[in-house]
A protein has these predicted regions:
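N-terminal Sec-pathway targeting helices
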Residues: 1-13
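Core hydrophobic alpha-helical membrane-spanning segments
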Residues: 12-21
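Electrostatic cytochrome c docking/interface patches
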Residues: 25-54, 149-160
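Flexible coil segments in periplasmic/lumen-exposed cytochrome c-class electron-transfer proteins
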Residues: 33-34, 114-160
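Periplasmic/extracellular electron-transfer cofactor-ligation site
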Residues: 45-47, 52-83, 106-116, 142-149
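Stable alpha-helical elements in mature extracytoplasmic
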Residues: 47, 55, 97, 101, ...
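Gly/Gly-Pro-rich "capping" loops immediately C-terminal to redox-active cysteine motifs
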Residues: 52, 68-102, 122-127
Length: 160
């Protein structure tokens, strides 16, 4: 026979799971994470889908098909330049405000930091503004809730 305390704790755990499951069904079974926004506008599923395709065509060759970046991305290459960083939660993209991400993508790193030698090209003559927004929407949509929340706060404190 099991001790009474074990039976009571097991019963309480099962009851808690039943309550959680009932609440999840009542809410449609989905857990809501912070909504993805970009430059103050809500991001749609279409934005993310378009951005995923544009990312694959224009960004993945350097930043990785899975947003993983280049190996040893924090260590300078022999030419003194930095490898392409990851855009997933292991990188630092989510530390930057939307406006900064948009500007770096549009103008390239050298356009934002004159004199900084980088392999990151400017995309303003390659992609339309809406396409750059879609790429950033896709990247942001892949981040876990913690990174999205942090980045939303950074963006809010940046005034945009």
């Amino acid at each position: 026979m099991k001790p009474l305390a074990t039976v009571l704790v097991s019963g309480a755990a099962v009851a808690a799971l039943v309550v959680i499951a009932a609440l999840a069904q009542q809410r449609g079974g989905e857990v809501s994470a912070p909504a993805v926004t970009l430059l103050g506008e809500p991001v749609t599923a279409e934005d993310v889908a378009v951005g995923r395709d544009l990312y694959a065509a224009n960004c993945a060759s350097c930043h990785g098909a899975n947003l993983e970046g280049q190996a040893d991305w924090m260590r300078r290459l022999e030419n003194g330049r930095m490898p392409a960083p990851p855009h997933d939660e292991t990188g630092h993209t989510w530390h930057h405000a939307d406006r900064q991400l948009f500007t770096i993508t549009s103008l390239g790193v050298g356009g934002v930091m004159p004199g900084y030698d980088s392999d990151m090209p400017a995309f303003q003559d390659v992609l339309a503004e809406e396409q750059i927004r879609a790429v950033l929407a896709y990247i942001k949509s892949t981040w876990p809730e913690r990174q999205r929340t942090f980045q939303a706060d950074v963006t809010a404190n940046d005034g945009g």
